């Protein structure tokens, strides 16, 4: 039985860590905390481009179709970098809705 991360999970973790290091400065966190909506929207667009909004959304609904462990790895990286994003709430909503046949899953996956 294998208890380590898969190669894909390690790659996901490294990608998110690199993104956080390069894109999420303390100044950016402060700007968003102070209500800079455009800064928050730009960050959200970048996270969508990485495919993180649809991490737990099934592929048939426009997402990545990954699992809860993958989402936990992303959240861990976000926590380390104090990333002010709605990743966790969107992920929980997507996970709850994934078997419902809801058309909103595609909207979650595409940050709509």
Regions found by a protein language model. Name each.
Residues 21-112:
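Glycine-rich flavin
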